[in-house]
UniProtKB/Swiss-Prot annotation:
Superkingdom classification of source: Bacteria
Residues where lipid is bound covalently (N-palmitoyl cysteine): C19
Family per record: Belongs to the variable large protein (Vlp) family. Beta subfamily.
Function: The Vlp and Vsp proteins are antigenically distinct proteins, only one vlp or vsp gene is transcriptionally active at any one time. Switching between these genes is a mechanism of host immune response evasion.
Note: Genes for both Vlp and Vsp families are on (usually) unnamed linear plasmids in B.hermsii HS1.
Signal peptide: 1-18
Membrane recorded as keyword: yes
Lipidation (S-diacylglycerol cysteine): C19
Species in which this protein is naturally found: Borrelia hermsii
Organism lineage string: Bacteria, Pseudomonadati, Spirochaetota, Spirochaetia, Spirochaetales
One Pfam family, short name: Lipoprotein_2
UniProt name for this protein: Variable large protein 14
Amino acid sequence: MRKRISAIIMTLFMVLASCSNQLEAEKLAAESKNTFFDSLVKIGQGFQDIFGIFGNAIGDALGFNAVKSGDKKSKIGEHFKKIGDGLTTTKDKLNELSGEISEAKNANGSSIEAVKSAINSASDVFEQLITALTKLAGVAKEAGSTDIGDTASAAALARDKDGVEAIIAGIKAIIDVADKSGVNIEKGNAGGPVNAAANTDAPAALAANAAAGANSTAKLAAEVTKADPWAMIDKINSAKAAVGVQLDANTNYGAGELATGTPNQANGSKAATNADLAAAVALKAMAKGGKFSHAANEDGAVKAAAVSAVNKVLGVLDFIIRKTVSSNLDKIREAVKGIKYSEITETDATESGDAQPTTK
């Protein structure tokens, strides 16, 4: 009888112990999941903050109205710097988030690595954009206190070749990074050629070897107004600066040649397309040195054309940069969505791997 009672008591003890262990295990599992969810909330909040950081950092720096008539070329540099600073802040915050993700509790290791990989990839893209923007800002800063659309009632002067080449290279770099990030870079509508038949035609204000004729500046402004910004960017992306080129009247010149070639015709020189002419105006307005030409009392129209051309280029560049940033942040967001719960922590896995096998 005593043996029977002892057996019953032992059984009850084992059942109670088992229940207690099960409850403790369930409690630990619940705590682990709560810790995991808390980590997810923290990561999600940090990521949402980053989405707003870039927009807040650059504020109202929208390229289509970045500069106005009367502004100095240094203003263009300030615009590039502001966007570059915003990207730097975003990149730094991403790196902070990467550290927080590494500390996430009870998260599946492979899903965490996927997020960190996406962050590293985005940081690399942002660094390339920052480098390009820093160089562009430097070119504009070097141009200094000269008016955007600097002009004279005399022969036009070619722009600094090195400065124009640096602008072309910076824009190329941004487009290349964006293209590799899956951003659609449109070709736009380049329009037809712009002839230089008289000194009253639009090309005279850009590249005449004497004072441009009456109303040439108004015609130049009209050409810039109708130019497709995407086509202008495309022409800059494929532009080549002229090396010792004396511009003639009949060759179909591209944007880089029109901006840096030596004016050699009273009527200016023919532009291959409307977009080439407008892009050349932008390049000439952004780089150091050189002048546009105008008839008496028409300098205001030249400056308006230059400002419009610059704003079109900056506007499309800003759009491309924003799309590139958004594309890379979206990739991180998708990776964050894929973070999975794991009952095995990194410490557990390490301890398990370090355990020595028993021998008999």
